[in-house]
């Protein structure tokens, strides 16, 4: 049955081949017509050539026209063959596709396979005959229509769904499965390698150091062994190259070679030629005998050929030394010994003089030591004939009873301002002390005053008690005056020196009664002192010691006319001359022990030096000695400054968050207005904090009560205005909060100076708003100069913090815009 089907199929296939042959001729004609249409220029050329032949000369050779016609026909025949060959290729592709299908069917029926094979043989024979019958034509490029048709056919073939048999689908599934298995195995292998690497690393970290050292040594030896093998191969190649170079050099030297002609320099050449001949290079030696010199390995103190160069040098020097010793006379030997002794003595003296000043006695101090001493304590002086500072209380020239009082008051070591101001004050010279707050200025002017008062006869002091005090100390605020009074009583009471405070808020009659009873020192505020002077409660006829404490603060508060009025009440009979005599200690100490005839001494202490203070100093001070301690007008280096930019409504919440951090009491909070001070204190008390207030609206008793409670520890927080910003010494203040920023940088510096006193550290926190932009620039500079503070970027990058207020900014020329 299968054979009959195959025969029938052959019969059906044979007529189709005959029809295919017949259909070739119309196809050729159709292609020829298309070529004629696509190339009308060729037809025109043919018509022209015919016309030329008709109208031309008959004498033209007929053989030439026949050959041209023959060439044309040959070209057309070649073109037809090329088209037939292309069509044959297309038919062959179709037959191949059909054969693949038949092969699949033949796998199911063996009979079909045999018929198909015979048919295939017949087709291949026919194709071979066709190929042998026609010559291979010249390849022609495909036309544009054929390219487009081919591309369209490919797109359609790709768009059609491809049918896959069951076997092909199974093969595809098997292939995908195999790829998935390989990918999984690869990932497992990578994970295994990473785990092994991690375990090896952990094992190396946990293993014994000795075991790790042995393992590293073993690995290093293995690497060296492998490296030595490679090195030996490289060494052999190197030796062969060196041998060839050495042989070449010997041949050139002794057998003669082509010598390179050296370039000669002509006279007209501008450039000098620095060239050396290659044979003149003696730095490289290719002979291994000289290249690798043998180093002899010796044990102990062995030497090559028994020669010890060091020993030879020693013996040689000893020989010449003995020879010179024999030639020297006795006098020369003595001179040499004296020279050595002098040299040793000079070196010992140099070492002795180079000791630190703390290891020397007072009489051993040199000018260099005093300069180092001043640098150690940041002391800078200005003025003529300034005495040296005191190193300690024992080294000072103070009387024993004064030293005893100082020791009882707990002053172990003098502060920098005390070290320099006390010796100047003992010479009866005018002083301007510029020092930071909390530097011990009170004792600096009190101790010279107490020394002078105690030198006066006690009888004179009692008899002349109705003529007024010996000293007047002016302070800008009541609190500072009371603080100075406490210190003065502490020093003066053991010495029998009476002190009276003349300040506002206390009955004037009580103060007048105490003044009539007699006193040596009066501590006053400018306003109340003028009132007392005008009402004749006080007569400054024997006042020869005037102190202006916190002079810059007094000027800022508008007390400059009052201070000038007070100084005009002083007697002029004991005023110093404004000459060089004011700098001469001998003339200044004349009549030092008399109460009336001693020159008046004026002392001014300030934290800053504004122009108004300088003007006051020029008017009433005579040739003063100026003492600068540290960086005047700048905050403590031990105070950490923190700044927060916020709105007014956020201040209270931020303050409570800061207080919850647990800062140790006492804490001072500064506010600009009296009303705000009371409101903030009440709100803090409602939150459970112990707070008290201090401002100018409070009575004197209330102010004293608030300060005493804070110092005693009954209250933890003091809410104050700028009244508490200057001069008030409250020990161990851990934090200062500027709830409202000060109006100028000087007040800000004095505010934060309440903490970080007496060598301790502190924290100063400031709340800033947009209204405080006038002080942004100076505040930024103050924070940047502090070594323990950091400026926040909100303040550092703020436009108002880039330039000082009032400066006119001009654009650079390259930033200017020119409008034409």
Swiss-Prot record:
SUPFAM superfamilies noted in UniProt: P-loop containing nucleoside triphosphate hydrolases (SSF52540)
UniProt: ATP binding residues: 435-442
Biased composition, class Basic residues, residue ranges: 43-65
Localisation per UniProt entry: Nucleus; Chromosome
Superkingdom of origin: Eukaryota
Covalent cross-link (Glycyl lysine isopeptide (Lys-Gly) (interchain with G-Cter in SUMO2)), residues: 686, 811
Free-text description of this protein's post-translational modifications in UniProt: In vitro phosphorylated by CLK1 and U1 snRNP-associated protein kinase. Phosphorylated by SRPK2 and this phosphorylation is required for its association with the tri-snRNP (U4/U6-U5 tri-small nuclear ribonucleoproteins) and subsequent spliceosomal B complex formation. May be phosphorylated by SRPK2 on Ser residues in the SR domain; the phosphorylation is required for the removal of inappropriate R-loops during transcription.
Primary residence: nucleus
Family (UniProt): Belongs to the DEAD box helicase family. DDX23/PRP28 subfamily.
Name of the protein described by the UniProt record: Probable ATP-dependent RNA helicase DDX23
Species assigned in the record: Pongo abelii (Sumatran orangutan)
Gene name in the database record: DDX23
């Amino acid at each position: 049955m299968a054979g009959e089907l195959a025969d029938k199929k052959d019969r059906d296939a044979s007529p189709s081949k005959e029809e295919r042959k017949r259909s070739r001729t119309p196809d050729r004609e159709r292609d020829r017509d298309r070529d004629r249409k696509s190339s009308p220029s060729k037809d025109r050329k043919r018509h022209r050539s015919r016309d030329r032949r008709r109208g031309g000369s008959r004498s033209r050779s007929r053989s030439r026209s026949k050959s041209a016609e023959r060439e044309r026909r040959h070209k057309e025949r070649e073109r037809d063959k090329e088209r037939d060959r292309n069509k044959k290729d297309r038919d062959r592709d179709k037959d191949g596709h059909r054969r693949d299908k038949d092969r699949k069917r033949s796998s199911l029926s063996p009979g079909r396979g045999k018929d198909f094979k015979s048919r295939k043989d017949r087709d291949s024979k026919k194709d071979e005959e066709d190929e042998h019958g026609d010559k291979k034509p010249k390849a022609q490029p495909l036309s544009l229509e054929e390219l487009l048709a081919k591309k369209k056919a490919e797109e359609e073939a790709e768009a059609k769904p491809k049918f896959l048999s069951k076997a092909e689908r199974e093969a595809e599934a098997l292939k995908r499965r195999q790829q998935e298995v390989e990918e999984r195995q690869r990932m497992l292998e990578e994970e295994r390698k990473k785990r092994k690497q991690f375990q090896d690393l952990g094992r190396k970290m946990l293993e014994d150091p000795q075991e790790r050292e042995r393992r590293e040594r073993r690995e290093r030896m293995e690497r060296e062994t492998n490296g030595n093998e490679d090195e030996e191969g490289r060494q052999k190649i190197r030796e062969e190259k060196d041998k060839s170079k050495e042989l070449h050099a010997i041949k050139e030297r002794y057998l003669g070679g082509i010598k390179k002609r050296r370039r000669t320099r002509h006279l007209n050449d501008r450039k000098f030629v620095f060239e050396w001949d290659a044979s003149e290079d003696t730095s490289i030696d290719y002979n291994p005998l000289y290249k690798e010199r043998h180093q002899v390995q010796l044990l102990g103190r062995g030497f090559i050929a028994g020669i010890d160069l060091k020993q030879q040098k020693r013996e040689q020097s000893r020989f010449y030394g003995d020879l010179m010793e024999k030639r020297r006379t006795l006098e020369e030997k003595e001179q040499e010994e004296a020279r050595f002794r002098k040299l040793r003595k000079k070196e010992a003296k140099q070492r002795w003089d180079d000791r630190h000043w703390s290891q020397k006695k007072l009489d051993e101090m040199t000018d260099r030591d005093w300069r180092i001493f001043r640098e150690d304590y940041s002391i800078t002086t200005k003025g003529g004939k300034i005495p040296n500072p005191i190193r300690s209380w024992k080294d000072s020239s103070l009387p024993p009873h004064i030293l005893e009082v100082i020791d009882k008051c707990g002053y172990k070591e003098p502060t920098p301002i005390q070290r320099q101001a006390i010796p100047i004050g003992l010479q009866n010279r005018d002083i301007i002390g510029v020092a930071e707050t909390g530097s011990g200025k009170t004792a600096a002017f009190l101790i010279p005053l107490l020394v002078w008062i105690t030198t006066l006869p006690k009888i004179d002091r009692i008899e002349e008690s109705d003529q007024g005090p010996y000293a007047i100390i002016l302070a800008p605020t009541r609190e500072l005056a009371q603080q100075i009074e406490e210190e003065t009583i502490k020093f003066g009471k053991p010495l029998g020196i009476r002190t009276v405070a003349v300040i506002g808020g206390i009955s004037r009659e009580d103060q007048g009664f105490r003044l009539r009873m007699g006193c040596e020192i009066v501590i006053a505020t400018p306003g109340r002192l003028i009132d007392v002077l005008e009402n004749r409660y006080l007569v400054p006829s024997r006042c020869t010691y005037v102190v202006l404490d916190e002079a810059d603060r007094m000027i800022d508060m508008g007390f400059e006319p009052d201070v000038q009025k007070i100084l005009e009440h002083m007697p002029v009979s004991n005023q110093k001359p404004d000459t060089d005599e004011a700098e001469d200690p001998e003339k200044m100490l004349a009549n030092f022990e008399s109460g009336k005839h001693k020159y008046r001494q004026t002392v001014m202490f300030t934290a800053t030096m504004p122009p108004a203070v300088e003007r006051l100093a020029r008017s009433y001070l005579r040739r003063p000695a100026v003492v600068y301690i540290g960086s005047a007008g700048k905050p403590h280096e031990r105070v950490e400054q923190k700044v927060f930019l916020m709105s007014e409504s956020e201040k209270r919440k931020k303050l409570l968050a800061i207080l919850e951090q647990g800062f140790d009491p006492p804490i001072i909070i500064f506010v600009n207005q009296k009303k705000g001070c009371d409101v903030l204190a009440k709100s803090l008390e409602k939150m459970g904090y112990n707070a008290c207030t201090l401002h100018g609206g409070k009575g004197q008793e209330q102010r004293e009560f608030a300060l005493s409670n804070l110092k005693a520890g009954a209250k933890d927080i003091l809410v104050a205005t700028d009244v508490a910003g200057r001069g008030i010494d409250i020990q161990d203040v851990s934090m200062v909060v500027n709830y409202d920023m000060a109006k100028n940088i000087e007040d800000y510096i004095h505010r934060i100076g309440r903490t970080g006193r007496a060598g301790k550290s502190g924290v100063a926190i400031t709340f800033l708003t947009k209204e405080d932009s006038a002080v942004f620039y100076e505040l930024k500079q103050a924070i940047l100069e502090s070594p323990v503070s950091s400026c926040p970027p909100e303040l550092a990058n703020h436009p108002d913090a880039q330039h000082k207020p009032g400066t006119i900014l001009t654009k650079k020329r390259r930033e200017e815009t020119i409008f034409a």
